[in-house]
């Protein structure tokens, strides 16, 4: 049952069922619809019924107002419909009684004219509610189907519903005739059972009198041509009311759906507005924090600029000095390498001269020995010749002394800490072994003394020795160049490390200065009452301490 309209429609059906009973009893005791057997139902009050909105909880005010409005309109329509139905029922009953009286009057007049010549008549029932032709009144009931005769037999067999009194013989004859002919004829499609029957029966008013045709109770009235017409104006009205109710219900559901959608959207918008307000508050707090951070960064930037103004100039000066020292070291080492090459070439030339002069010097020595053995007096005369050999030995000694001086100069040269890879080390590969020249010269002299004719072999050996020495010198030069390149890379790396350390030191200085200022500010804020206390000697300014730290770091890097 519909929770909204169910109770009202149920009352409406009760009103429709119970309307015929009280009205028929008040007007003459007859009933509609062929005299039904249902008991009369009490009429519902004509005022508006109590309206209870569906749903477990209280409805919103808009929906409650809409439902109350619709309920009041429905109750007004029900009241009007009930009054109109009562009026129509009274009109139909009066028309029926008027026609019944006219029929009785007409039958009485015909009875006076015909006298006793009239034929015997039987009860006749007519079904209404369709437009198909009706069988004539003269047709015997025995020729009718059983389906058509049975409803009228039931109606005629109820003596309480007949205003003319009991008719037991005619009812018995009708039932016997209908049962005897029910097997002969089948029900016709045109005579379908209806809801309302109007019947007329012939009764005898007294012994020996003509039978009188009397119209029974019912809602139908018969045209002069014998066609029954049903007057039903209530059902279309009820259908129209149902249509109106359905339309109102659809509109109510549509309004309810729209209201629920709007209510949901409003709730969502309220939630969204609350979220946006919270986000706006959080954004304001973040903005304030960022503003404080910006102020702090500005203060730190001012401090950093003040510290960097002096540090940059000092750092640039130190970098320039370092670059100049590196260039000077590279130039000095190139000059030393060139001098070493010149000395080695000069020594090679001296060795070649000694090699070719050794045989003559050996012959002179033998002659000198023979002369000394022969006469000791000749040794004094040989004395002035010794300076020639002494001059040669003095040249060799001078070359050796120059080489030794160059090596000592290399050892005594003060290299930087980051250029240790370029320091000269006298190893087996780098040390110039000048004894090889003299040993080779002595071996060549002995070989020449033994084989004086093999001069060509000596020349070849000398050339091979030159090639070997040249190769060794070239390898030494390549090694020195490699060490120079390595030293340059090391110097660049150390320079970058030094710059990174300087940047780290600057950052630490900035942080220390910031912390010092914050501590000073916090101390000033916390103890404003102790400003009058006499202070001790002021500490040295931070710039001097920082300068001393920078000098120490620069000295360590230079070392």
UniProtKB/Swiss-Prot annotation:
Signal peptide: none annotated. Residues 450-525 are annotated as: XCCR4 binding. Required for localization to the double-strand breaks (DSBs). Its main location: nucleus. Keywords: Coiled coil, Intermediate filament, Membrane, Nucleus. PROSITE patterns: IF_ROD_2. Residues 85-117, 237-301, 455-501 form a coiled coil. Ubiquitously expressed. The keyword Membrane applies. One of its GO terms (biological process) is DNA double-strand break attachment to nuclear envelope. It is found in: Nucleus; Nucleus, Nucleoplasm; Nucleus inner membrane; Nucleus matrix. GO terms for cellular component: intermediate filament; nuclear inner membrane; nuclear matrix; nucleoplasm; site of double-strand break. The keyword Membrane applies. Residues 550-559 have a biased composition (Basic and acidic residues). Residues 39-57 have a biased composition (Pro residues). It comes from the Eukaryota. Residues 21-57, 158-187, 360-394, 520-559 are annotated as: Disordered. Gene3D superfamilies: 1.20.5.170, Vasodilator-stimulated phosphoprotein. Residues 73-526 form the IF rod domain. Nuclear matrix protein involved in the immobilization of broken DNA ends and the suppression of chromosome translocation during DNA double-strand breaks (DSBs). Interacts with the nuclear lamina component LMNA, resulting in the formation of a nucleoskeleton that relocalizes to the DSB sites in a XRCC4-dependent manner and promotes the immobilization of the broken ends, thereby preventing chromosome translocation. Acts as a scaffold that allows the DNA repair protein XRCC4 and LMNA to assemble into a complex at the DSB sites. Belongs to the intermediate filament family. Forms a heterotetramer with XRCC4. The interaction with XRCC4 is direct, involves LIG4-free XRCC4 and leads to relocalization of IFFO1 at the double-strand break (DSB) sites. Interacts with LMNA; the interaction forms an interior nucleoskeleton and the recruitment to DNA double-strand breaks. This is Non-homologous end joining factor IFFO1. It comes from Homo sapiens.
